[in-house]
From Swiss-Prot:
N6-(pyridoxal phosphate)lysine carried by residues: K263
Matches recorded under HAMAP family: HemL_aminotrans_3
EC numbers: 5.4.3.8
Protein name per UniProt: Glutamate-1-semialdehyde 2,1-aminomutase
Pathway the protein takes part in: Porphyrin-containing compound metabolism; protoporphyrin-IX biosynthesis; 5-aminolevulinate from L-glutamyl-tRNA(Glu): step 2/2
InterPro entries the UniProt entry points to: 4pyrrol_synth_GluAld_NH2Trfase, Aminotrans_3, Aminotrans_3_PPA_site, PyrdxlP-dep_Trfase, PyrdxlP-dep_Trfase_major, PyrdxlP-dep_Trfase_small
Primary enzyme class: isomerase
Domain of life per record: Archaea
Keywords linked to the UniProt accession: Cytoplasm, Isomerase, Porphyrin biosynthesis, Pyridoxal phosphate
Length: 423
């Protein structure tokens, strides 16, 4: 018995399903356990080296164990790792975010993307004094009650339409419409405008594969929000700092009222950010009536890692390397995978996905028609050949500054070999 299997047998008695996040159980026949990581490489407890295209599901845009991040974390640990008071690094990281996102005047640091979207929605409701929100079918905004309705991601992989334990009274306040369908958004928004607090959207869907917005779609959301008095919330937990320093809102030229960030902004440590216009943000406690608090908010180690990461991103080379790697692998998927099995490949900057067996994917319903079995087989065959991609087409491939030419060439060889044995 290998060590990963041995550990999983123990874990099944300790954790529901043997894991602490559902997607980790999707690796078959059982999850592998990681001992260490560096650059673009994971090393399992059994000594197997894997090129990593999951990167912690997005945060590690510099790759694993980047020396600048490691140095910053070590320096902070030597000064203490939890104060329960304000500290200088939270100011420095906030200043960076405000400088990169013109829509953001102020921020509140929290501890996860889930906390960020939960706080943003509560804030929108408190500010507008309205209750309903519009979300998009297949957009994932974390694991809290308001957004566990047609939520994509691991929910999709395991075939669960929502979640048990969410009261119907709560889910009724969440109105779900198809992504990229302006007409549907406008209809639902205007029918509910007297009680519509917010429209929340992943500007690029990243938890139903990778689905970009159609030309003008996000600008139409801005218009509809303005006309109905709702706040527009961009959930940039994935796209923030991945599509560029200014995220999706800079790329597509649309200014939201509130933005949520996470993943990259913590440099690989737990983090969430809510940011927006001053007059909205000041509704948060202690300056306003909308409650938010947290023992670990603006954790010093996270702030150090995030600041080091963003300092490195400002140098520019990270985006050049990561985007180039993504372009090459996505092109290979188009030339080899699509040629054999059909489908489409979507890439936005350094995130991409192949949807086998479908002609177009503009929304979650389209994504559900893709051949999940072929996608899972590719995951399995690449894993045998030393490449780790997410075990679900409802996730994305991610690249980093560590995915240089040698890493990409090894990936392309493994991809060609894997596709030959899939039928």
């Amino acid at each position: 018995m290998d060590r990963s299997l041995e550990l999983f047998q123990i874990a099944k008695n300790l954790f529901p399903g043997g894991v602490n996040s559902p997607i980790r159980a999707a690796v078959k026949p059982y999850p592998f356990y990681v001992k260490k990581a560096s650059g673009a490489t994971l090393v399992t407890v059994d000594g197997v080296e894997l090129i990593d295209y999951v990167l912690g599901y997005g945060p590690l845009i510099l790759g694993h164990m980047h020396p600048k991040v490691l140095e910053a974390v070590e320096e902070q640990l030597n000064r203490g790792w939890l104060y329960g008071t304000p500290h200088e690094l939270e100011i420095e990281l906030a200043k960076k975010i405000v400088s990169h996102y013109p829509s953001i005047d102020m921020v509140r640091f929290v501890n996860s993307g889930t906390e960020a979207t939960m706080t943003a929605i509560r804030l929108a409701r408190g500010f507008t004094k309205k209750n309903k929100i519009i979300k998009f079918d297949g957009c994932y905004h974390g694991a809290h009650d308001s957004v566990l309705v047609k939520a994509g991601s691991a929910v999709s992989h395991f075939g669960v339409p929502g979640s048990a334990g969410v009261p119907e009274e709560v889910s009724k306040l969440t109105l779900v419409v198809p992504f990229n369908d302006v007409e549907a958004v406008e209809k639902v928004a205007k029918e509910n405008q007297d009680d519509l607090a917010a429209i929340i959207v992943e500007p690029v869907m990243g938890n139903a594969g990778v689905i970009p917005p159609k030309e003008g779609f996000l600008k139409e959301l801005r218009r509809i929000a303005d006309e109905t008095g709702a706040l527009l919330i961009f959930d940039e937990v994935i796209t923030g700092y991945r599509l560029g320093l200014g995220g999706a809102q800079a790329k597509f030229g649309v200014v939201p009222d509130l933005t949520t960030l996470g993943k990259i902004v913590g440099g690989g440590f737990p983090v969430g950010v809510v940011g927006g216009k001053r007059e909205i943000m000041e509704y948060l406690t202690p300056s306003g009536p909308v409650f938010n608090a947290g023992t670990f908010n603006a954790h010093p180690v996270t702030m150090a890692a995030g600041l080091a990461t963003i300092n490195e991103l400002e140098r520019g080379y990270v985006y050049e390397v990561a985007n180039s790697a993504a372009e090459k692998v996505a092109k290979a998927l188009e030339q080899e995978a699509v040629a054999k099995f059909g489908g489409v490949v979507h890439r936005v900057a350094s995130m991409f996905q192949w949807f086998p067996g479908v002609e177009e994917v503009n929304n979650y319903a389209d994504a559900l028609k893709a051949n999940k079995e072929i996608s899972l087989r590719l995951h399995e065959e690449l894993l045998k050949r030393g490449v780790f991609i997410a075990p679900s087409l409802f996730e994305a491939w991610f690249t980093s500054a560590a995915h240089g030419e040698d890493v990409v060439n090894k990936t392309l060889e493994a991809l060609s070999e894997a596709l030959k044995v899939i039928s």
